[in-house]
Amino acid sequence: MATSISTQRGQVFIGELPQDFLRISPTQQQQQIQLDAQAAQQLQYSGVMATMGRLSITVVQAKLAKNYGMTRMDPYCRIRLGYAVYETPTAHNGAKNPRWNKVIQCTIPPGVDSFYIEIFDERAFSMDDRIAWTHITIPETLKEGKHVDEWFSLSGKQGDDKEGMINLVMSYTSVPAMMPAQPVVLMPTVYQQGVGYVPIADPIYNPGMPMAAPPPAVNPQHETREEDIQSIKDMFPTMDPEVIRSVLEAQGGNRDAAVNSLLQMVEDS
């Protein structure tokens, strides 16, 4: 309960302050970076994950109901499947008819049968504006080897299924189950004395897993594969590809160790 104290300028009421008093709420972009990092970390530490298959999604184009803003919109798409987040490039001046033709390769974890897609208008001096979204169930016909080329209705400020439509082409590829995961090497600290520099740390083993012999030294000249860079880029869409390449090379091409290092860089930034 507030109390009253008299001063030279008048009465002042003193009471309990709210918990969020003088606190700055994180922006939408900061929250998104934290969510992406948590999603990537949960995927990295999930241990054994027997995947069902690989889903190829081609985001072709969209027909939107309205151009929001004073100028032509610069739309891009964001797809969430399981714990993974993927983004298309920005269709500059795409307005109501953006075209992307972006192919996204997604790994489908067990129990996941749908994905969520959003369309944002990229802004230069303010937060990106979410203009449309929809929830899509993965068609069962894909597992029969068929391709799906369909238009899906979008929801937004105009109402459910009234914000336009988006054209997606999907295909499915079966992949063998993954082998049991090896002990994960965790990097507690990353010193950014130079891009891609990561200190050597002792391996930390997951509880309940047998101790394994230390792996042989990795040749520092290990060739970095482009598909590994693209796979990590899909997990960190805002990360510079050259930074990903440098970290991957510093880890001798070890994709899991590179993801660990990038997660630490995101948390420390």
UniProtKB/Swiss-Prot annotation:
A motif (AIM1) lies at residues 133-136. Coiled coil: none annotated. Residues 224-267 form the CUE domain. Pfam families: C2 (PF00168), CUE (PF02845). SMART domains: C2 (SM00239), CUE (SM00546). Keywords: Autophagy, Cytoplasm, Immunity, Inflammatory response, Innate immunity, Repeat. A motif (AIM2) lies at residues 151-154. GO terms for cellular component: cytoplasm. GO terms for biological process: autophagy; inflammatory response; innate immune response; phosphorylation; ubiquitin-dependent protein catabolic process. It comes from the Eukaryota. It is found in: Cytoplasm. GO terms for molecular function: ubiquitin binding; ubiquitin conjugating enzyme binding. Residues 35-152 form the C2 domain. Interacts with ATG8 family proteins (via AIM motifs), and ubiquitin (via CUE domain). of cytotoxic polyQ proteins aggregates. Both ATG8-interaction motifs (AIM1 and AIM2) are required for the association with ATG8 family proteins. Component of the signaling pathway of IL-1 and Toll-like receptors. Inhibits cell activation by microbial products. Connects the ubiquitin pathway to autophagy by functioning as a ubiquitin-ATG8 family adapter and thus mediating autophagic clearance of ubiquitin conjugates. The TOLLIP-dependent selective autophagy pathway plays an important role in clearance. Belongs to the tollip family. This is Toll-interacting protein B. It comes from Xenopus laevis (African clawed frog).
